[in-house]
Amino acid sequence: MTDAAGKQDQAGQASLGIAHLVKQYANADRPVLNDISFDVPHGKVFVIVGPSGSGKSTLLRTIAGLEPIQGGTISLNGEVIETGKPGTESAGRSKRSSELRTRVGMVFQSYDLFPNKTVLGNITLAPTLVQKRDKGEVEQEAIRLLERVGLADRKDSWPHELSGGQRQRVAICRALILHPEVLLFDEVTAALDPEMVREVLDVMLELADSGQTMLIVTHEMQFARAIADQVILLEDGGIVERSDDAERFFTNPTTERAKQFLHTFEFDRHRKSADQSERSEQ
């Protein structure tokens, strides 16, 4: 697994670097992402928040290599993964860039497990097929990962036999077994029932404690506050506010837009609490 201790030794150094990133679709009037710049240090958790349609998921997709960029650079440990070219719709990466990209893992909102493979088969496919690692060693590591997320007894199950929360935990194991230096999470609890959200968030908190470098897009503000080291508020494809002190962002944001955004979530939380109280009294 990823060497958390080594990451801590490099704390403060940029693991993932985003510089002046631009993403614009063909025939679009304006960029989806415009002049985005930030660094994610080794062993830190960087959280992206913002309203729907702000470009959060698109940003993660560009970092993961699923969307080409039209400006700026994406780098890992100082080596450029991708340089944007205006008007291009394909990335055209070098062999070295492709190798670096494999060090960035991603967990999606929709699980994306193969329905025709067991839990163990889903986790072991990429490391044996792509990384050419020994099948026996990979299976042993997969079982250890399943134990870590409380699913060792489901290794032979099929995806349709699992709950949404269990499938998402399998997806996290599938990403971890590739030993990513940086792990991206895109609204991984958005498709889950409320009762299943906690089990996934607990796994992510444990990963943060172990020193895994993470970039997280989430609408769970209480969770974001608990896990984030650094945070940005994204809106209309641009950074509205950035804080290297996440707690300060959540308690004392500097921009009016950030204050308004956080107040909305605070209102929603109180409203949900009131609704629950009313139901309990009936």
For the regions a language model picked out, list residue spans one by one.
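Conserved ABC ATPase signature
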Residues: 158-162, 166
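Catalytic Walker B motif of ABC-type/P-loop ATPase nucleotide-binding domains
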Residues: 183-186
